[in-house]
């Protein structure tokens, strides 16, 4: 065997200078209308870099655990901060979610009004210390917090609200990927360097390089140009350089046959390699490795009514009111988040005009879709509800193994269950992808999560992911921006529906995406649920696996047999605890089964199994509990109709709801209305204020349904080893 190394796709200096020409050629080839309507106008646009030094004039807001310290800052006091002796400083809030930065109802704004909103949902203990407009009036230019800032939703309204309130710099111990990228795309600076605090307060001119240190070459230039859109215009004008992807291939001799073999790669790396653009603007390179940066062409781009209107406004403002998107056939819009908002929004919020604003989101998306010729999965014609949640429909009808998909939602990794790389992006990434059909990517490291052995009968994928979320490796932020690759015998036994629960909740881990290597179960899914020819489906998954010598940043191993039903206690999905570890019975008032995570066919099997068991024993949903079951899509509703589940749900006392994100986004039946109200939900996150003011526990469909019958949180015992006693 003879081996030598050869560099493929090496650009060199000439390659660096032709990147803009390649992008222009590719766009012009994709759509002739771009020649006149978009590209020429952008090529004439004047684009300049921001100054190479930054001087901030204003105050610093420390987001502390102590609400009184925050109130004192809002009243005008500048909090002392000892950068040399951090132990002397008050504790900063960790795990600040985008739900806290911009609570869902205020995301109905998509203009500078958001500057009145930042941190309205921030909870310090039981107190929300920041009122509307107080950050903006306080003259703050920098906000400081602890670990995992910006976790949760991909909503770009959060950094946009901060920016409109005057915040120019965000400092935290570590920062979630999507939130950080949204900040960079908008021009908000981010850092994990706490020594900047004294320098900002001292009015020092800080080199911009302090904020680009450690970033890849593309991100550095995005920051230097003040955001993604000006960077992309500069990219078309040949003013920027893209780093070469230097793929090393080995020449192997097998008899008389010479071939170049790519180095070992993970499944995700293989898919990235298929989609990265080379120096000629062509799609695909021989291999990639973690840290490689560039642009990847997306097979599918989608967004929903929370994001599409803001992206459309940006597109019309910066590109042109009459400009057309690039390849409308690969873009999909969804009306899924706010379908039932009118049933739960408070009178106070109605008086603020928020319901009217939410309706405008719907109309703006409809109008933009019609104008651009983009497919919109909207509301039902004959009854209230949506066609389905975006993630549910994308898995049921669109995503394919080996694809690279991007969506305006943090739970876009849902479809990784059939072996595609799918990840969430923010508004600016969305509208830029409408121009370029690609997305900037830094190839992430992968974490291999092996779940060995055989699971218990009452344990589900949701219990697995809640266990993973409770691990120190995840809670400390070490998994941030990495691919979660799930494998092992217990994963292989899971259906595609169950696997999607785990890939979906890679978002709660803070991962880049989640993925499972496609196998016979993925093929069966494509054949049985999509009607695809089996040979075609089988050929589609060829080569989609991680190589034996692929490199991982970390490996997590769990024994499925040791995992029992779990809950995440209120406040964070990482607060995992076994149900049997709850010290006292926890009565519940609301049980909720639904959302993209738990509104699938197999989730309905679980709700129906528990309720059918209860009916056999003469029991129903406890009188003290309201149990809501919401379908993820019309396909799942039809499945329940065929299986006879609707009758079971009705007889057992559950309330059935047509598809929508609903309670998970504080916009439908199942939300809490009082701080002391206890909810058990099969949704994916329970950040403060996410689904109302109450105390939310996360659990599996089995546990949610069993608790609805019992009246308090219990494990489901399929063999009736334990009698459910109504509270």
Language-model regions, residue ranges each:
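Fe-S-dependent hydro-lyases/dehydratases of central metabolism
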Residues: 1-7, 12-727
């Amino acid at each position: 065997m003879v081996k030598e190394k050869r560099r493929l796709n090496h650009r060199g200096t000439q390659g660096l200078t032709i990147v803009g020409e390649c992008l222009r050629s590719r766009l012009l080839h994709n759509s002739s209308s771009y020649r006149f309507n978009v590209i020429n106008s952008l090529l004439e646009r004047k684009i300049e870099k921001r100054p190479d030094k930054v001087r901030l004039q204003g105050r610093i807001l420390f987001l502390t655990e102590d609400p009184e310290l925050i109130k004192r800052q809002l009243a005008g006091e500048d909090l002392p901060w000892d950068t040399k002796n951090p132990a002397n400083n008050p504790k900063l809030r960790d795990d600040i979610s985008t739900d806290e930065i911009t609570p869902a109802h205020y995301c109905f704004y998509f203009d500078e009004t958001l500057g009145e909103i930042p941190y309205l949902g921030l909870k310090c203990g039981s107190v929300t210390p920041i009122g509307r407009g107080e950050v903006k009036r306080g003259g703050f230019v920098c906000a400081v917090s602890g670990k995992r800032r910006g976790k949760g939703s991909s909503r770009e309204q959060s950094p946009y609200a901060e920016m409109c309130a005057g915040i120019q710099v965000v400092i935290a111990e570590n920062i979630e990927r999507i939130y950080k990228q949204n900040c960079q795309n908008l021009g908000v600076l981010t850092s994990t360097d706490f020594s900047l605090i004294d320098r900002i307060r001292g009015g020092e001119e800080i080199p911009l390089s302090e904020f680009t240190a450690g970033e890849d070459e593309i991100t550095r230039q995005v920051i230097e140009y003040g955001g993604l859109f000006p960077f992309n215009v500069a990219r078309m004008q040949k003013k920027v350089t893209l780093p070469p992807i230097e793929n090393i291939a080995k020449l192997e001799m097998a008899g008389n046959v010479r071939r170049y073999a790519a180095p070992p790669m993970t499944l995700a790396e293989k898919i990235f390699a298929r989609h990265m653009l080379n120096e000629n603007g062509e799609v695909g390179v021989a291999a990639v490795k973690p840290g490689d940066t560039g642009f990847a062409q997306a097979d599918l781009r989608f967004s929903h009514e929370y994001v599409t209107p803001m992206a459309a406004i940006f597109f019309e403002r910066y590109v042109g009111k009459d400009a057309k998107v690039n390849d409308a056939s690969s873009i999909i819009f969804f009306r899924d988040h706010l379908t039932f908002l009118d049933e739960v929004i408070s009178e106070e919020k109605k008086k603020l005009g928020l319901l009217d604003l939410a309706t405008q989101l719907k109309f703006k998306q409809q109008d933009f879709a019609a104008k651009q010729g983009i497919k919109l999965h909207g509301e039902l014609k004959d009854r209230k509800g949506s066609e389905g949640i975006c993630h549910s429909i994308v898995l049921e009808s669109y995503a394919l193994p080996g694809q690279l998909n991007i969506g305006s939602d943090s739970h876009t990794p849902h479809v990784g269950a059939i072996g595609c790389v799918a990840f969430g992006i923010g508004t600016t990434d969305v509208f830029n992808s409408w121009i370029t059909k690609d997305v900037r990517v830094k190839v992430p490291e992968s974490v291999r999560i092996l779940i060995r052995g055989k699971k218990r009968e009452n344990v589900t994928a949701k219990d697995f992911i809640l266990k993973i979320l409770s691990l120190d490796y995840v809670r400390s932020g070490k998994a941030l921006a990495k691919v979660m690759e799930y494998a092992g015998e217990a994963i292989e036994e899971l259906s595609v529906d169950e696997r999607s629960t785990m890939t979906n909740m890679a978002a709660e881990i803070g991962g880049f995406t989640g993925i499972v290597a496609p196998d016979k179960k993925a093929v069966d899914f494509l054949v049985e649920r999509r009607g695809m020819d089996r040979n075609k489906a089988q050929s589609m998954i060829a080569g989609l696996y991680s190589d034996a010598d692929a490199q991982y940043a970390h490996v997590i191993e769990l024994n499925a047999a040791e995992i029992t039903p779990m809950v995440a206690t209120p406040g964070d999905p990482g607060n995992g605890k076994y149900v049997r570890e709850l010290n006292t019975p926890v009565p519940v008032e609301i049980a909720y089964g639904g959302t993209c995570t738990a509104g699938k066919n197999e989730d309905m099997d679980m709700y129906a199994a528990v309720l059918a068991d209860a009916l056999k024993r003469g029991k129903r949903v406890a009188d003290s509990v309201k149990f809501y079951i919401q379908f993820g899509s019309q396909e799942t509703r039809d499945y329940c109709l065929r299986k006879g589940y609707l009758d079971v749900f009705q007889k057992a006392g559950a309330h059935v709801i047509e598809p929508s994100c609903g309670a998970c986004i504080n916009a439908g039946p199942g939300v809490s209305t009082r701080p002391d109200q206890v909810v058990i939900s099969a949704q994916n996150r329970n950040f403060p204020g996410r689904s109302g003011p109450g105390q939310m526990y996360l659990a599996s469909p089995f546990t949610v349904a069993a608790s609805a019958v019992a009246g308090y949180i219990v494990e489901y015992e399929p063999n009736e080893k334990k009698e459910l006693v109504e509270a």
